[in-house]
Amino acid sequence: MPYDAVVSGRADAASDTLTRFGAIHLAAVRAEWAAARAAGLDLRVADGGGLLLGAAPTFPSTMFNRGLGFTEQPGRIGEALAFFAEHGVDGEIVLDPADAPSGIEPRTRLDAYLCAADRIDPAPVDGLSLHVVDQDEVDAWVEVIVEGYAPIPEVAAIWRSTAPHLVGISERILVIGELDGQIAAASSSYLADGVGWLSWAAVLPSARGRGIQRSMIAERARLTFERGCKDVAAWALVGAHSAANLAGAGMTWIGQRVVIRASDLA
């Protein structure tokens, strides 16, 4: 087989993996946005043709002003710019670094990971127990998330109001961790098309530095596999401790993504 044919095959496999990564991320965000809208957030959404666009003009954060699907369809960026302009927000677009215009500094750089769910070994921590959250525990779960991430008050409020809409859904798993009998950690995953997206993950400051994040990655991978998903996926800020945790847990780095402001692309 010619050398260039081998390279092409590998490139196609890498592209397929990143496309799968993009699909599960889009599905997970779609579900979170649906929960936020159910909680009363004024979030305008355009969803179709492999793209997902959101705009929350009155919300003081960019977390809902976002465009997904453009890593696979960069030629449609103009649709995102028009959507954000229509709703009066400076949204953000997730792109492959190769498609980011030169001279523009991304707002965020993210490492993407995906691997077989049964490949991640357990990572027990002395005194730590992890279990799936039921309806009665969702308030405790979200308080750990809020304290762990420490968002601005408006974001904390929407997270609290959204949380009841996350529990009791077969596609979503919420996990809470107790260290020596005290609640210390919380995490979640979203399941779609045979892949589990590892999303929220927070450890209270008093319990950090013990390997709890790594333990939660392993537990969510186990639960994902138990529910019929072949793979798990996640992303993390380039160079962040969370990226090191994903790599240390055995997840495979598959590439990078960048987040670009719409105003920088206009």
Enumerate the predicted regions with their spans:
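Short amphipathic alpha-helix that is part of the acyltransferase structural core
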Residues: 1-28, 68-71, 75, 112, ...
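N-terminal charged segments
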Residues: 1-86, 92
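Conserved beta-hairpin
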Residues: 44-49, 97-105, 124, 171-185
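Acyl-donor-binding surface of acyltransferase catalytic domains
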Residues: 70-136, 239-242, 258-262
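Conserved acetyl-CoA-binding loop-helix of GNAT-fold acetyltransferases
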Residues: 74-82, 203-205, 209-226, 244, ...
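Conserved hydrophobic beta-strand within the GNAT/NAT acetyltransferase core sheet
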Residues: 93, 198, 232-236
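Conserved active-site tyrosine of GNAT-family acetyltransferases
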Residues: 101-102, 245-247, 251
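A conserved beta-strand-loop-helix scaffold within acyl/acetyltransferase catalytic domains
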Residues: 153-206
